[in-house]
């Protein structure tokens, strides 16, 4: 049985929560996020807290309640503080630049790679080999970071490619004669 769902999500005073049937909307200084809640989960909003419990008749009720609680907690953190994800470009001639909502990258291909950012996500390049993604939605930030990394994954022999800042790339030893 999940114990995650038993802990309530505390809502700060500057965050507004609206519960409309199975759709919950959370609004804060960094924007507004909404999500549809699984039908097996019952959400109650009282005393600046969100509490989660399974509905009767669902086998996976506690599991869904725990998942929903984690998603709601991420939404509250997103609209108050926001999320960041850092990427590094490792390789000779690999560089990135941001123009509006488009990230332009040179990754060793015969053409530059342009990636358009979705709404609510901003990017900046502190240096030519670093990309910092910022936004309120944790899932969208992770998805965009994964898409950028997929253009040129770190290869195992020299480690060249696009990697997360906290990623450790295991380098293989070259074949010996």
From Swiss-Prot:
One record GO biological process: cytoplasmic translation
GO molecular function: rRNA binding; structural constituent of ribosome
InterPro entries assigned to the protein according to its UniProt record, in alphabetical order: Ribosomal_uL6-like (IPR000702), Ribosomal_uL6-like_a/b-dom_sf (IPR036789), Ribosomal_uL6_a/b-dom (IPR020040), Ribosomal_uL6_bac-type (IPR019906), Ribosomal_uL6_CS (IPR002358)
Annotated keywords: Ribonucleoprotein, Ribosomal protein, RNA-binding, rRNA-binding
Cellular component terms (Gene Ontology): cytosolic large ribosomal subunit
Organism of derivation: Photorhabdus laumondii subsp. laumondii (strain DSM 15139 / CIP 105565 / TT01) (Photorhabdus luminescens subsp. laumondii)
Protein known as: Large ribosomal subunit protein uL6
PROSITE patterns: RIBOSOMAL_L6_1
Subunit structure: Part of the 50S ribosomal subunit.
Keyword rRNA-binding in annotation: yes
């Amino acid at each position: 049985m999940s114990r995650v769902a038993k802990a309530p999500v505390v809502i700060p005073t500057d965050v507004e929560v609206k519960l409309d049937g199975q759709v919950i909307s959370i609004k804060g200084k960094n924007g507004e996020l909404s999500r549809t809640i699984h039908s097996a989960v019952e959400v109650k909003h009282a005393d600046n807290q969100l509490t989660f419990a399974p509905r009767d008749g669902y086998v996976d009720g506690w599991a869904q309640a725990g998942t929903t609680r984690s998603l709601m907690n991420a939404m509250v953190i997103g609209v108050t503080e926001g999320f960041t994800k850092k990427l590094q470009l490792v390789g000779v001639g690999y560089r990135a630049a941001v123009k509006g909502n488009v990230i332009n990258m040179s990754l060793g291909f015969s053409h530059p790679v342009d990636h358009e950012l979705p709404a609510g996500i901003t990017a900046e390049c502190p240096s030519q080999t670093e990309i910092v993604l910022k936004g309120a939605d944790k899932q969208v930030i992770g998805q965009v970071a994964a898409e950028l990394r997929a253009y040129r994954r770190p290869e195992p022999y020299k480690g060249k490619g696009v990697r997360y800042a906290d990623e450790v790339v295991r380098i293989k030893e070259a074949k010996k004669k």
